[in-house]
Every structure is written in structure tokens, then in C-alpha cells.
A protein has these predicted regions:
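Membrane-interface helix-boundary signature
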Residues: 1, 44-47, 78-85, 107-117
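Individual transmembrane alpha-helix segments
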Residues: 44-63, 72
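Cytoplasmic juxtamembrane regions at transmembrane-helix boundaries
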Residues: 67-89
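Hydrophobic alpha-helical membrane segments
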Residues: 84-101
Length: 148
């Protein structure tokens, strides 16, 4: 499991690096990325380009979040915290994918959702990794039932 967490940490860091290589936390940069910018000769993102990203991200992020949240179920936390962790991580992942489509094809205001969902997704993945690592490294007992 620790080896998986190391790979997940690499994915987490590279996800942030890829995001910040194209955009910033400024919604204007998100709009420029998705809608294009004539001043910098940037073309708008095509539907096919977005679809290809969605195709791979929906599978990869789904499996990643399924695995991380499954591991979190064994961490001694209340059922309420576990449920929130699962809902927030999957919600952030879906919102992060949908927000780009929203910016491109609905309204530039979805750029705020893209920034927020990216930050929430990165935060939830980091929290899941840290919770699982803490439980493993400090020999915390398994608590699948969430009785704590």
C-alpha cells in the first residue's frame, strides 16, 4: 500500500504541474486556455481534444479515487468523515472534468468552478493519501466499521 501511495504522490504532483503549466488559479487564465487567446495565438480547445482527455481521465481518476477511498474505509475515522471524504473526492473529480466543458461550451463563468474543483480535488487526494499513510506508518488498527 505504501508503494501505491508513492505512485499516487507522483500522480498528485504531476497533476498540479500539468495544470500550472497551462493555467493558473486566475480564472482568466482558465478562460484563455479553453476559449483560446488571439493575442498569444492560442486556439480554443476542440471538442475532440476535450473528449480524449475525458475518456482517459474518467477511467484513471475513477480507479484512483475508488482505490484511495477504499483504503480510507480501513482508517479509524467516523463514518461521517469517511462519507464526506468519498463524496468530496468523487464530486471534485467530476466537477473538475465538467468545468472545462462548461468554460468551453456554456459560459466563461465556469472558470471559477474549474479553479475551485481543481483545488478541492488536489486537497482531497492529498488528505486521503496522508490519512492512509498515517494509519499504515503508526500501526493504527483497522476500523472498517467506523465505530470511532
Amino acid at each position: 500500500v505504501l508503494c501505491f501511495l508513492v505512485y499516487t504522490a507522483l500522480l498528485w504532483a504531476s497533476n498540479a504541474a500539468l495544470y500550472f503549466s497551462k493555467m493558473s488559479l486566475n480564472p482568466d487564465s482558465v478562460v484563455s486556455y479553453y476559449l483560446g487567446d488571439p493575442a498569444t495565438f492560442r486556439q480554443p480547445r476542440s471538442m475532440l481534444g476535450l473528449l480524449e482527455v475525458l475518456h482517459f481521465h474518467s477511467f484513471a481518476m475513477g480507479i484512483l479515487l475508488l482505490t484511495l477511498t477504499h483504503l480510507m474505509l480501513f482508517v479509524p475515522l467516523s463514518l461521517r468523515i469517511k462519507a464526506w471524504g468519498i463524496a468530496l473526492s468523487f464530486g471534485a473529480g467530476l466537477a473538475n472534468e465538467a468545468a472545462g466543458w462548461g468554460v468551453r461550451f456554456v459560459h466563461p463563468g465556469f472558470a471559477w468552478a474549474k479553479v475551485f474543483s481543481f483545488l478541492l480535488l488536489e486537497t482531497t487526494i492529498l488528505c486521503l493519501m496522508l490519512l492512509v499513510a498515517r494509519a499504515l506508518l503508526f500501526n493504527r488498527p483497522s476500523d472498517y466499521n467506523g465505530d470511532t
